[in-house]
Amino acid sequence: DFRRYLHKNLEDFIIETPLENSLELLNNKFDQSQIKTVQEKWKPYNFKNQNIDDFLQNLNIDKTVEISSINGGYSNALKQLNKFIDNGYEDYAKFSSNPSKEASSQLSPYFHSGQISTHEVFEKISNLESWTLESIDPKMVGRREGWWGSTENFESFMDELITWRELGYHTCVRRANYDQYSSLPEWAIK
């Protein structure tokens, strides 16, 4: 099953985290032909003398969609992570699926739009629990609980952060109809 596969292959990815300033490796050596192609498709726009309200009115977007109550950006994502650690994490395993309790991380919109990295969240929660690779219990491979060798909250949160996110990602990549009701398995429809 997927969890068993993930447990057997995850350690390398936990050890090898993204570089903090990976774009610096480019040394500003962009392929000029790619830049030209992008500029031909999306013409550069000078906003200096533009009335922003007029500009937005002319965009072909659904203007009935209301403004989100969630403030985006990295600093707000970090505030939400800290709020979760201070107010929800201690009850995560028990109440994360209960919408009337404030135990879920509420980080999904920040993950979705790339405003905070799962690697950063993993590192912060791991440090909170003093978790290390040596904590892993290889006898628990494939099990929902116990493999991480940590607290119930840590086990539950990592199952969501890593296992279910990866499963969702791979489902979207491998199933053309992932966004259709007909793609749901029979057990989920019931």
Q: Where does each model-flagged region fall?
A:
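Glycine/tryptophan-enriched, flexible segments
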Residues: 3-188
